[in-house]
């Protein structure tokens, strides 16, 4: 087909008429399509409907430790839900804080806390002349909206099939003390679906930040979201790798059940070092007495354990797989 610049007036008018007829044909179908990305379909949402029946007015509402989920307490989440999400994120329970329905909310709070109170005793970012974040591109627009909102300068980092350009990441992180963080989606990263290579993960863990308050924001949103159960991507555990490299406090890992149970009505968590957990506790216990523990209990009783989560994800995969194989 010729480019529009090469077409004559008659050819352009003919093409315009043809396209208008095609448009009218599609318009006549009366379709109402929601093109928003990241929203599970109705058949996927139906998979979790039995969860709404596992707790009712006659249910025992106590945790395994005997705490009443209807009341205040358990600022870091009920123990069994912390264990469930720890297993999902492949970390230790003591490193996990279970929050509300949104991991994005935790990320926002984590940046806001760093702006207002600093990071583990460092100077609050709001008092610094310049704060920069590295942003692998293409990436998640909602990550970038958070840093944009707080006036943080964003630096694009190119991506390839192995993940971010680590030569560039190391150059910025190891030499510029105004670089305070980097956004990462290490597994099945949108929109390309790439997973970070083992080498990339280990190079992240072995960074030597010029800034003592530099943090990796590791959004492991798709950690169990495999299309094929027998063949799927695996990555080294970033918390373990950072600890081995002598950088135990350098990473915040985020996760949720938003694409597992109900988007907007799931449970979310942050996993990080014990030192970071303690710093977060000092602020979070002022901010909130406890999140929705009834929803946490509901998720635990529905999924029961990590095997229940994985079996549920296989049902999602069965719905989605034909779309990838079409």
Identify what each model region corresponds to.
Residues 220:
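Walker B catalytic acidic pair
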Residues 2-76, 86-87:
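N-terminal "arm"/small-domain region of PLP-dependent enzymes with the aminotransferase-like
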Residues 181, 215-216, 252:
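Hydrophobic "anchor" residues on beta-strands that sit immediately upstream
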Residues 44-49, 227-231, 264-267:
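Short aromatic-enriched loop/helix-cap "lid" or pocket-rim segments at secondary-structure transitions
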Residues 99, 240-321:
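Conserved core segment of the aminotransferase class I/II
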Residues 15, 81, 316-326:
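Alpha-helical packing segments of well-folded alpha/beta enzyme cores
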Residues 67-212, 223-246:
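Conserved core of the PLP fold type I
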């Amino acid at each position: 087909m010729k480019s529009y610049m090469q077409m004559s007036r008659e050819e352009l008018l003919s093409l315009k008429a043809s396209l208008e007829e095609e448009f009218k044909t599609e318009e006549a179908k009366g379709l109402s399509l929601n093109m928003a990305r990241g929203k599970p379909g109705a058949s996927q949402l139906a998979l979790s409907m039995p969860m709404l029946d596992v707790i009712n007015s006659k249910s025992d509402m106590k945790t395994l430790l005997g705490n009443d989920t209807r009341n205040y307490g358990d600022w870091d989440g009920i123990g069994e839900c912390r264990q469930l999400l720890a297993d999902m994120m492949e970390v230790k329970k003591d490193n996990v804080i279970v929050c509300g329905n949104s991991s994005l909310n935790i990320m926002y709070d984590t940046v806001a806390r760093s702006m207002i109170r600093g990071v583990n005793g460092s100077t609050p970012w709001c008092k610094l002349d310049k704060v920069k974040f590295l942003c692998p591109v293409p990436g998640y627009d909602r990550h970038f909206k958070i840093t944009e909102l707080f006036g943080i300068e964003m630096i694009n980092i190119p991506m390839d099939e192995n993940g971010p350009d680590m030569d560039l990441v190391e150059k910025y992180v190891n030499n510029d003390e105004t670089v305070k963080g980097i956004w990462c989606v290490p597994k099945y990263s949108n929109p390309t679906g790439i997973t970070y290579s083992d080498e990339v993960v280990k190079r992240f863990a072995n960074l030597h930040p010029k800034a003592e308050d530099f943090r990796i924001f590791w959004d492991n949103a798709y950690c169990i979201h495999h299309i094929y159960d027998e063949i799927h991507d695996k990555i080294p555990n970033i918390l373990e790798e950072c600890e081995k490299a002598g950088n135990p406090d350098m990473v915040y890992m985020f996760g949720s059940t938003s694409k597992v149970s109900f988007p907007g009505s799931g449970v979310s968590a942050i996993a990080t070092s014990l030192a970071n957990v303690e710093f977060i506790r000092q602020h979070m216990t002022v901010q909130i007495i406890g999140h929705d523990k009834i929803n946490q209990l509901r998720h635990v009783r529905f999924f029961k354990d990590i095997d229940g989560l994985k079996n549920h994800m296989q049902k999602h995969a069965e719905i989605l797989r034909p779309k990838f194989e079409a």
